[in-house]
Each structure stands twice: as structure tokens, then as C-alpha cells.
């Protein structure tokens, strides 16, 4: 089975059904909330919350279902028959893709195989019924899921979003197709993995957690069903899917809403006071299952499961644990520590000897992904940076929401620009170990107009993932911005005008033209522009970047 909507640990998704259901629905795992404070009977309350979804005839008694919708979110269109969940009109998905057989059916959602008409490439399309989006929180959940998928785009073990579309009845999320089935299926088929294979799988899973956390995202619903195989013949071609319960977080932020799946939920989530450490707990539960075939906290009822989670006793006596290595058990204990402060971070898990043994995972610090993007950005020439700013300003809100969160977190004085001290403090919060000199280099690289600060558009341009550049409409729009007279060429005069508009002085225009101009006609055509934008960054703009850095040092 390919990409699928969420299901429970026991219930398998339907597959092979070619008939499209009359209604799609929002994909969601159990999402718990309670307006009451935690009490000694918390397990009873939580169990009741988990069972609410099974009482479909009691919707009128659920206060979450009668929250009025905010008008800016639920905008009516001219025919008064639908609203825009995404906040804007999108192309008709059926003009771009052909939807065919069903890949999976979850509790509230359906995923279909879809084929891009222009290229013939297959993707997965998750369809969400707008009729099921009852509250403003439901709408915000869908928006946030799309925003987070855009924010995490480019990681090798995270499913890639292709685009989001909306019509009068549904929201459709088109994403990379994972045709190899679920990791869940492999666990059921084999019962358990060898320690070596379990270590390799754990490295992938925790690598996703580390990437999410470094970019300010907490997944909150990790489980085997949410990892799919791209290739059924490759056990390790895993991709994380389903970010419907994921949220953006700031360092030190505390969450109180109870979400997740019973077997995998961390004790602090049940106690309504948690942070990203809960994802590490969940990954530890998955590791336990990979090695034994059963979850560590087991009971016949949900209340019993919650009691076991809160007690925190881990069974290492039953088979096969007597023959499992001490190193593996040590890692599990440290991932399943009941105290979040004593639990390993995702990065520390990747450095644990059991994971690192035989070179499975490198024992070195990993900078957050945003830093690698900044480093790539520093190698670009000025034209490419200006083009990125043009593209960044045209991106949809869902594509840049995560970066906006990071910018606002770093811009502590709300001035609309990041100073060196704010950049340094912000990078430290996101786990950076860069030296001051390296941060200065990043600052200089991102500060396109040499103002001494990084404004919002410069930050977005410097940190947006480069796969956004592959979209033809963005490249065309950026080229047309520079080609003022519509001649099909960017001339040195037009480049000069663009530099003035962006407040860039002392730019070596001739050098920029020479670096991009392949046929030596003294101007840049569209093909040369596209090649520059899509070319590997390591060899782009080094001479111009050195000149720019020299200018910055002279100005200083």
C-alpha cells in the first residue's frame, strides 16, 4: 500500500478499492483535549477522551464542535457554496492530476493514487472533506499540516509535498508516492528485526525527529503506521508521513493538549505538560517494538495502557530480551526515561554507541538544517540572491509559515530585522555550535543589501529550501522581474536597476553577467538564468561572493 491516512495500531487500512467514497474526510489520529485540570483520576479522564471518537451520535455534546468559525479562515466564494480553507483560491486539481484507485482509508480520510497529466508521474493525493472541518481548530490543523510539510521539504526521510489544492468540497494534498507499504506491515510479518537492522531503522526514525526538532517542529504522532517504504524491496527506504498533529514550537515552550496514539503517548503528554522530548519517548517505543514485536506498555484497555505508561515499568525479562544486547536495552531505558529532562535528545540518541556501532551513525554534531541552507546561500552570487528574494516574496503563506515562525523567534525586539546578536542567540537556541566568525560569515551572506541586519525577505530567501526553485512559475516570474522591457534578456542596465531597487551598492555587475552569460553576448537569456538558479551552489558565485565579503570587511 502507498501513502495512507492514519489508522490505529491494530486496525489496518483498506486497500485495493477502486471506488471513490462519496465523502472524504480529514485525516486525524485521536486528538485529545480537556478543559479540566489534571487530577489523580487522570487515566480515567484520558481514556474517556480517547473513546469520544467512538460515539458518533454525541457530537452535540462535544464543546469543541460548536466553536464559531473565524470569518478570515472560512471565506465564502462568490457562489456562496464553499469557503477557502487554504485562505486563497487554487487551481482545479483535476486540470493537473488524474485521481484513480484508493490507496488507503483512515478513520477520517482517504488517499488516492494520482497521476500528473503533463508528466505521467504518479503521486499520492490525500483528500480531506471540508464538511468534516467543524471547528476553527480543524481548519487550522489542515493549514498547519500543509505549512509544516513545506517547512520540512527536502529531508531524505520525510515525504515531499507536491502541492495543495482546494475545491468546493475538499482539500487535496498531493505528495510523493511511497509504494512499498508500511513499516507496520514489516513488523507484523517478521515479528522483530535483527539488532543491526533495528539500529539502522532507528537511525532513520530518530533522524527524522532530529530534523523536525532542529527546524522547530514537534511531530506528536510518530508510530510505525506513519512510516512508509518508497520501495517494497528496500527495508530502509523509509519516509515519515502524516504531520496532521504536528506543531511549530519555540525552545522552552510547554504544550498542554493531549494528542497522539495510546501505545506511543509519553507520560508527560498524559500529564498535560510536555515539549519535544515526547517525540523521543515515542521513538523509544517504536525501537522496543522493532526488537520484540510488542509495545512496552501493554494492557487490554486504554485506561490500562495509560496506567502502564505512567508507571513506566519496562519489561526486559520476557523473550527475546535475555538475548538482546545490553547496549540496546541501555538506549531504550534512556529514551523511555519517565523524566523528560533526563531523557536523551534526538541528537544524543544518534550518538549512542548502539546506533553508532560499525559506523551506522556518525558521532559528530549536526547543525540544524537551516544552517546548511544559510551556508549554501553564502556561495551564491548577488543575482541569484535577488532572484531568491523575488521568489520568496511570491511564495504562499503555507510554504513559508515555518520560516516565519523562526524569524519571529529570533527577532526578539520585533524590529522586523535580525541583528548579529539576535542571530547568534537564535542559532544557539536551535542547537548551533557555530563560532562567532562563522555566524558573521552567515550574516554577511544573508544581508544582501549590506544594511548590517537581516530583514524578513532576506531571511526567507536565505533559508527557503532550494527545491522551491524547481517550480517553473517561480523561475518565470523571477526572470520577468529583472527583464523590465520584456525583451527576453537581462541586460546590465536592467541588473543595475534591480540593484537599486534592492538597495544594493558596490555590486560588480560585469562579474555577475560573466558568471551567468554562457554564450558571451553580454546579457542573460532565460535558459542561462534557469541554469544559474538550478546549478549546484558549490561552484556558483564564488568570485562575486569573495568580492562582496571583501567589500563588507572594508566597510567595517
UniProtKB/Swiss-Prot annotation:
The keyword Acetylation does not apply. PROSITE patterns: EF_HAND_1, EF_HAND_2, PROTEIN_KINASE_ATP, PROTEIN_KINASE_DOM, PROTEIN_KINASE_ST. GO terms for cellular component: cytosol; membrane; plasma membrane. The active site is at residue 221. Ca(2+) 1 binds at residues 411, 413, 415, 422. Residues 398-433, 434-469, 470-505, 509-539 form the EF-hand domain. Pfam families: EF-hand_7, Pkinase. GO terms for molecular function: ATP binding; calcium ion binding; protein serine kinase activity; protein serine/threonine kinase activity. SMART domains: EFh (SM00054), S_TKc (SM00220). Gene3D superfamilies: EF-hand, Phosphorylase Kinase, domain 1, Transferase(Phosphotransferase) domain 1. ATP binds at residues 103-111, 126. It is found in: Membrane. Ca(2+) 2 binds at residues 447, 449, 451, 453, 458. Ca(2+) 4 binds at residues 517, 519, 521, 523, 528. A lipid is attached at residue 2 (N-myristoyl glycine). Residues 361-391 are annotated as: Autoinhibitory domain. Residues 26-39 have a biased composition (Low complexity). Its EC number is 2.7.11.1. Ca(2+) 3 binds at residues 483, 485, 487, 494. It catalyses: L-seryl-[protein] + ATP = O-phospho-L-seryl-[protein] + ADP + H(+); L-threonyl-[protein] + ATP = O-phospho-L-threonyl-[protein] + ADP + H(+). There are 3 contiguous domains conserved in the CDPK subfamily: a kinase domain, an autoinhibitory (junction) domain and a calmodulin-like domain. The autoinhibitory domain (361-391) inactivates kinase activity under calcium-free conditions. Belongs to the protein kinase superfamily. Ser/Thr protein kinase family. CDPK subfamily. This is Calcium-dependent protein kinase 5.
